[in-house]
Design a protein with these regions (language model features):
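Internal, well-folded beta-alpha domain core
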Residues: 42-191
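Active-site helix-to-loop segments that bind/position phosphate- or nucleotide-bearing substrates
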Residues: 1-44
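Extended, charged low-complexity segments
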Residues: 190-199
Length: 199
C-alpha cells in the first residue's frame, strides 16, 4: 500500500494504530512537509495572509477529503493514488466519488488548480461546462513544447499560493503577474482552462 522503506512503513502503521482524530491535532497548513508546503511558508504569513488562505485555499487529502488550512489533522500517510480497496470501492477515487468536487466548487464555480494530476483528477472529471477549472502549469520550453519537472513544479505551486496570499488576489487576471523563480506567464501556451508559466 505504501511505496516506502520499512522504517517509514512501521512509523505509519503505528500512527494508524494509535490515531486519535479528536485531540492533539495540528492545523493542516502547518502539518504537511512537502516541497509545495515549504514554499508556501505559512509560518511567516501575516494575519491578513492567513485569513486569505483560510477563505480561498482547499487542501485535497486521500484520508480527510477536502481540508481548509486551519482544519485540525493528525499525522498520516495516504496518497490519493493509493490502490486501497474499501467496501464497494476499488480505490480512493471511487471511495470519494464527487464529494471533493462538490466541496471545492460550492463557493463561486471557479477553481484555480494547483494540485498534482494525482489529486486534481478527483475533481476535474466532474466539472460542468458552466464552471471554470483552470489548471496552472510551470515548466521550460524545449523545441516549442513546455516540459514540466516534478520538483520544480512543486516548488512553483507553493510559491504561487504564497504570491496569491501576499497580494490578496481576487482577480484571475492578476495571477498572470506572477514572476517568481524566473517564471513568466506564457500566453502562447495558455488557454481559458490553462495558465502556463515558463522560465
Amino acid at each position: 500500500m505504501w511505496k516506502c522503506n520499512d522504517k517509514i512503513a512501521r512509523l505509519n502503521a503505528e500512527r494508524f494504530r494509535d490515531m486519535n482524530l479528536k485531540t492533539g491535532l495540528t492545523p493542516a497548513i502547518l502539518s504537511y512537509e512537502g516541497l509545495q508546503y515549504q514554499h508556501i511558508a505559512p509560518q511567516v504569513f501575516t494575519e491578513k495572509e492567513l485569513t486569505y488562505i483560510q477563505e480561498h485555499l482547499c487542501i485535497l487529502s486521500g484520508f480527510y477529503g477536502v481540508l481548509k488550512p486551519f482544519d485540525g489533522v493528525t499525522p498520516y500517510r495516504l496518497e490519493m493514488g493509493t490502490k486501497l480497496e474499501t467496501e464497494g470501492c476499488k480505490d480512493l477515487y471511487e471511495f470519494w466519488g464527487d464529494k471533493l468536487y462538490q466541496e471545492v466548487i460550492k463557493d463561486d464555480g471557479i477553481v484555480i488548480n494547483l494540485a498534482s494530476k494525482e489529486y486534481s483528477q478527483s475533481i476535474s472529471k466532474y466539472i460542468l461546462p458552466k464552471e471554470r477549472f483552470i489548471t496552472v502549469e510551470f515548466g521550460e520550453v524545449h523545441n516549442g513544447k513546455v516540459k514540466q519537472k516534478g520538483t520544480f513544479s512543486k516548488m512553483a505551486r507553493g510559491e504561487m499560493v504564497r504570491y496569491m496570499a501576499e497580494n490578496q488576489i481576487e482577480d484571475i487576471e492578476k495571477i498572470k503577474e506572477f514572476h517568481v523563480m524566473g517564471l513568466q506567464y506564457a500566453e502562447e501556451f495558455s488557454n481559458e482552462n490553462k495558465m502556463v508559466f515558463t522560465v
